[in-house]
Amino acid sequence: MAGGDSLCAMSADTPPARANPDDPADPQPTGGDRADETGSTEQPRETHKGPVTLRRGQVESTTTDQRLLDTRGPTDWVHADPWRVLRIQSEFVEGFGALAELGRAVSVFGSARISRDSAEYALGREVGRELVKAGYAVITGGGPGTMEAANRGACEANGVSVGLGIELPFEQGMNEWVDLGVNFRYFFARKTMFVKYAQGFIVLPGGFGTFDELFEALCLVQTRKVTSFPVVLVGTDYWGGLVDWLRSRVLAEGKIAEQDLSLFSLTDDPVEAVRIVREANETRRREVEEEATEAAAADSHRAERSGSPGAGRRRR
């Protein structure tokens, strides 16, 4: 600056000169410049975190890199929501990677609280065996009770037995009959895997967790988020009251449509449950093949009517 003046020596009436507005090294005043009681102009405190601008009281005293490299710093940042987004992403990546080559599978749900000598445990075990005989892998929540029974049946039938565990304060770890296990922190990531890698649900008697998985599947089918996804309830005595209530109260009051009650089937027979799933899958496979054939025929017909540019030139 001319005359050897400096910013510190300038009077309050003299604005700081901008030697080179295009030079990033030259500090530029902003619209947020403020004058204190002495008349000096100060820059507002401002930092950037990616697309986020922070000023004044929102400015952090340390940088992201500094906190990363300072091993003596606090560690509670790993529990902040932005970090959780990365953790959630990692759960989807791990789940997709582990299950991508699974092949045909069915998710089986039911209570974690039944004993191994109960009729429901035997029922779950038979469901697992029948699914393997029909060519399906068995996916469960990986826990005890019905989940263990279905995994055990699949394992004993020399099939693929999958467990998708969840971090809970009171649950046991992955049961011993799981051959391929993936653990999750977040329910929604885990439930995505149950639907994405299964060709249907078989639901045995269970509690709130079972109801959650059942009604999420029904909602996804009802809203066409998934198509041709068979849901089979096993245990007419257990599920009958719920089905009656859906018909006599929910349907009667117009809160669901008549066709919504056809989104699931009810049986006592594990063999029939697997047959329902298999037939629904075969029907859907034929529909997809027919749709592909019709689409190819329509494309061919349009091409014949319009003619290719090359064909037109040859005729001339």
What is the predicted role of each segment?
Residues 5-9:
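Short, positively charged and aromatic/hydrophobic N-terminal segments
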Residues 11-18, 29-166, 173:
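Glycine-rich beta-alpha loop segments
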Residues 15, 233-316:
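C-terminal functional extensions of proteins
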Residues 94, 98, 136, 155-159, ...:
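Generic secondary-structure signature for well-ordered alpha-helical cores
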Residues 99-101, 130-132, 154-155, 172-176, ...:
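Solvent-exposed alpha-helices and their adjacent loops that cap or buttress functional pockets
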Residues 145-203:
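Acidic/glycine-enriched connector segments
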Residues 167-173, 210, 238-241:
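Short gly/pro/ser/thr-enriched loop/turn and capping motifs at secondary-structure boundaries
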Residues 185-237, 281-286:
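Active-site/ligand-binding-proximal alpha/beta "capping" segment
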